């Protein structure tokens, strides 16, 4: 009888533990994966659902949220009261949602944090420029740019009549970034994107000729979604593998696993995470497991111990990084 009672107690305890685990998983799933919890509606600043009389109160709420959640301003020696007062004075004078939206964009960018973003939609040509040795170039133009007369390797020397360096300097105030080089680079990449402009003039240098092209910038849904590979591989000189990891956003893990077998047995491997703006931290961690030799703590969370994969790379690794390597991509390089 005593044995039966003990068994009964054990069963009850096990059932209670299982019930607790189930409840925990249920709460976790509902809190973190319920779309209603994370649903966000994005707007073009010209279409913000606000009237001028609402600007000041809306901006006050934004500032309060920042103060409650952004403790890093102290380490960056930011005078938040001064920043708020300077922006608030301009908010009171704003007449349109475009005026107001650009002030908010400046405020967020002044936080000097690449993770602090407004999520405003931008008009675009769906094209990134090449920024090489502080020069702007058209790089493999898409059909839309080609239609308006752009050609590969055109050098952009002015935007809207401003020399391109001056244009970058004037627009850096709208760019979210943690460092000065990163801010400049990201601003250069915005040559074909804008929060407010729907039309831009570009002065191009092509060979020995100078020409001007007027280009409408479109809403993002004008362009079809192209599924670009997040990881690319190639082999140099028969013995050097080259992996370009463009992002840590999904589906990077699936793309990585598809190309990794092509390079895993080569004696040398170059991993290029330049221009990788980050994404999901766990993707960076899981990819890193293929390039470590022994268990080690994750650089961000020391309590998380990374274990090397069974088929982890055993050759010599060269890692390429730059001032645009950010967030999950940066922690990947540190690991």
Each predicted region: which residue ranges?
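Flexible, low-complexity junctional segments that flank or bridge functional domains
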Residues: 2-268, 275-277
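Short hydrophobic alpha-helical runs that function as membrane-insertion/retention elements
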Residues: 270-271, 299
């Amino acid at each position: 009888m005593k044995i039966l009672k003990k068994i009964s107690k054990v069963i009850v305890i096990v059932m209670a533990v299982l019930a607790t685990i189930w409840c925990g998983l249920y709460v976790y799933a509902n809190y973190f994966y319920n779309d209603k919890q994370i649903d966000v509606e994005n707007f073009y600043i010209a279409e913000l659902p606000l009237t001028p009389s609402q600007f000041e109160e809306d901006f006050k709420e934004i500032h309060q949220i920042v103060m409650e959640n952004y403790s890093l301003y102290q380490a960056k020696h930011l005078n938040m009261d001064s920043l708020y007062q300077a922006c608030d004075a301009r908010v009171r004078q704003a007449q349109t949602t475009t005026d107001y939206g650009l002030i908010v964009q400046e405020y967020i960018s002044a936080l000097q944090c690449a993770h602090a973003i407004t999520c405003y939609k931008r008009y675009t040509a769906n094209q990134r420029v090449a920024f090489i040795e502080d020069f702007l170039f058209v790089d493999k133009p898409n059909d839309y740019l080609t239609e308006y007369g752009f050609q590969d390797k055109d050098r952009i020397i002015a935007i809207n009549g401003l020399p391109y360096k001056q244009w970058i300097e004037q627009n850096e105030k709208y760019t979210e970034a943690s460092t000065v080089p990163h801010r400049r680079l990201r601003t250069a990449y915005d040559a074909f994107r804008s929060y407010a402009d729907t039309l831009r003039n570009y002065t191009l240098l092509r060979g020995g000729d100078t020409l001007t092209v007027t280009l409408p910038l479109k809403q993002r849904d004008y362009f079809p979604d192209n599924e670009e590979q997040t990881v690319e591989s190639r082999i140099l000189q028969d013995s050097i593998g080259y992996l370009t990891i463009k992002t840590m956003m999904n589906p990077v893990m699936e793309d990585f696993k598809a190309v990794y077998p092509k390079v895993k047995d080569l004696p040398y491997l170059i991993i290029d995470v330049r221009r990788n703006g980050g994404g999901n931290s766990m993707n960076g961690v899981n990819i890193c497991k293929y390039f470590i030799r022994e268990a080690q703590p994750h650089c961000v969370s020391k309590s998380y111990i990374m274990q090397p994969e069974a088929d982890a790379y055993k050759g010599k690794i060269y890692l390429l990084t730059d001032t645009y390597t950010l967030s999950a991509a940066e922690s990947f390089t540190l690991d």
